[in-house]
Amino acid sequence: MNVTTRENGGLRQRDLDALARAEHADPFAVLGPHGDGAGGQVVRAFLPNALKVRIQARDDGRVLAEMEQGSLPGLFSAHLDKAQPYQLHIVWAGGEQVTEDPYSFGPQLGDMDLHLFAEGNHRDLSGRFGAQPTQVDGIDGVCFSVWAPNARRVSVVGDFNNWDGRRHPMRLRHGAGVWELFIPRLGVGETYKFEVLGKDGILPLKADPLARATELPPSTASKVAGELSHAWQDHDWMAQRAQRHAYNAPLSIYELHPGSWRCELDEAGEIGRFYNWRELAERLVPYVQELGFTHIELLPIMEHPFGGSWGYQPLSMFAPTSRYGSAEDFAAFIDACHQGGIGVLLDWVPAHFPTDEHGLARFDGTALYEYDNPLEGYHQDWNTLIYNLGRNEVRGFMMASALHWLKHFHIDGLRVDAVASMLYRDYSRKAGEWVPNRHGGRENLEAIDFIRHLNGVAAHEAPGALIIAEESTAWPGVSQPTQQGGLGFAYKWNMGWMHDTLHYIQNDPVHRTYHHNEMSFGLIYAYSEHFILPISHDEVVHGKHSLIDKMPGDRWQKFANLRAYLTFMWAHPGKKLLFMGCEFGQWREWNHDAELDWYLLQYPEHQGVQRLVGDLNRLYREEPALHEQDCQPQGFQWLIGDDAQNSVYAWLRWSSSGEPVLVVANFTPVPREGYRIGVPFGERWQELLNSDAELYAGSNVGNLGAVASDEVASHGQPLSLALNLPPLGVLIMKPA
């Protein structure tokens, strides 16, 4: 043994050089305790900038040895006559520290965990990987782990080691490409990142992909989180959820962005402080109950660096954003919703992720989470990267994210964003700018397999949860069972209905006669999928105008058109979704940096729209004909679909027991007196709702609450009603 080796605890020069450069691939081979072959052990610790280190007994603090610093600054070593549990007493320039040696502990991740991870079949990644507070050999600490198979070295860095990547290099578990390290005496709330020496020699600081808590943006570090300790009180809701989510049950969704629904304003009237989840629950739950929605849908709440993405460019798929509080606060919010009889759906983004340096992009110096080829892995529309769902570990990562929210947080469903971009390799790409699949086609076979697998696993692991597709193409069978060749979603957003009906309602009434089929065309395919009718955030931003501002005419006509449109929507087959602000007719487009214009509710027209939405929801829930057969063609019957000259539509909705509701819509500002409409039976039909009623700030044209039927056959029916149709109004009636 030469002098250099002897001075440095028996290490060879190449090990010393690797430690000095922070490039040692196997720190456990050189650091920590190593047997000397005679019952004793050599202990080495690499502690750059330490002034002095001694080894002391773990049980009673006896000094066992003073460690010597060799030729490599920061490398301390000592010999112990016998192997025993020990601690390091470290003297720094700013104070002293006593800790167990991270390199004295064995591997912490089990072989089965690593095997399931590599297969992509680990269902609880957030409960085993990332940063897990735990106890090893009676010592409290945190076990860190991260997948980076192509990295040359990975270290845990944070305030606890002055962000020095030389201090805590990790152990590589070769079979799975996972690096791990147990660091004693760390706890919940500690900030950290991974310093990854990539295959390309670049040394970025990466946030933990499996972090369950993060710093508040614009800071980007991960935070150690404990197990969710919330004591759930939503047992009744969870027991009844599958029944509430049946296709024959009402489903009416209030879509909202939690930061701009309500907030605390500063003196300039801008957002001064976001409400915490618990504060939000106190305000939101009574409001949603009063309006009669069955569910809320939150724009993505997974941590995202850029608030202007509205959450649709998330980087922490397991961490609720810290903007509104902790994971415990979020759990309390969901619990409060459930106890108030309100379901909670989350928008979830498995299609793509942003390119931020601290995120998933080229995580270990290679394209790890994304496709390597930009023609497959880069989304030019959003400047984002596309998940490589053909890779086991990535597929397992996304599956575990979905289950994390569904199981740990009792989420009632996920609305999967941008499904069309996942299904097609040529989505929004020109010829020559995409890579065909192995059969030469445009379908993304890996994403399709993932989606089907996701829906199957979710149905088993989270019974009763809804997985909903935002899918804008004519892909067949999106909401059909996978056993029948479908994708297996519970529902699909009906984007075609939304585009057609909004185009129609924006036309001046004098021109609507030429667009008559735009309001009725949706019924041709209404039962090809299980549909949700969405008036979402996307329709009230980017110069598209707010919902009421899309309406033509003067102020009175705009409100009448809006009320008629919403009533038409609620009476149309399909479940309902309405974005916040639309329920009271906000004039401004949605702005994520400002709360809704609640002051408008001092005006009767806005109060009227809000009251109408509440009454529509109550009617929708109370009348079986309006919800039981939303997804069954026998639940709908046209009476008048061809009166383009008068812009009138009329139809019957039927309950499963044969009870009808009549819907009549007049989309011109001209009242129609004595307009005859056939009905199947009933001596007297009562008005359940009139969108032109005075209590909605309408002109109050109607039928004085009820109409007697005449024995005059009409529209193929034996009886008929002579109705007064309100201008720009919709009537909903049923036999008295």
UniProtKB/Swiss-Prot annotation:
UniProt keywords (A-Z) are: Carbohydrate metabolism, Glycogen biosynthesis, Glycogen metabolism, Glycosyltransferase, Transferase
Active-site residues from the entry: 417, 470
So where does this one cross the membrane?
none
The pathway that the record names for this protein is: Glycan biosynthesis; glycogen biosynthesis
**What cellular-component terms does GO give this entry?**
cytosol
Instruction: Enumerate the InterPro entries for this protein.
Output: A-amylase/branching_C (IPR006048), Branching_enzy (IPR037439), GlgB (IPR006407), GlgB_N (IPR054169), GlgB_N_E_set_prok (IPR044143), Glyco_hydro_13_cat_dom (IPR006047), Glyco_hydro_13_N (IPR004193), Glyco_hydro_b (IPR013780)
User: What is an annotated GO biological process for this record, any one?
Assistant: glycogen biosynthetic process
Which chemical reaction does it catalyze?
Transfers a segment of a (1->4)-alpha-D-glucan chain to a primary hydroxy group in a similar glucan chain
EC code: 2.4.1.18
Give this protein's Gene Ontology molecular function annotations: 1,4-alpha-glucan branching enzyme activity; cation binding; hydrolase activity, hydrolyzing O-glycosyl compounds
Which SMART domains has this protein been placed in? Aamy (SM00642)
Similarity comment: family membership:
Belongs to the glycosyl hydrolase 13 family. GlgB subfamily.
Q: How does it assemble?
A: Monomer.
Q: What does this protein do?
A: Catalyzes the formation of the alpha-1,6-glucosidic linkages in glycogen by scission of a 1,4-alpha-linked oligosaccharide from growing alpha-1,4-glucan chains and the subsequent attachment of the oligosaccharide to the alpha-1,6 position.
Protein known as: 1,4-alpha-glucan branching enzyme GlgB
Q: Which organism is it from?
A: Pseudomonas putida (strain ATCC 47054 / DSM 6125 / CFBP 8728 / NCIMB 11950 / KT2440)
- Which gene name does the record give? glgB
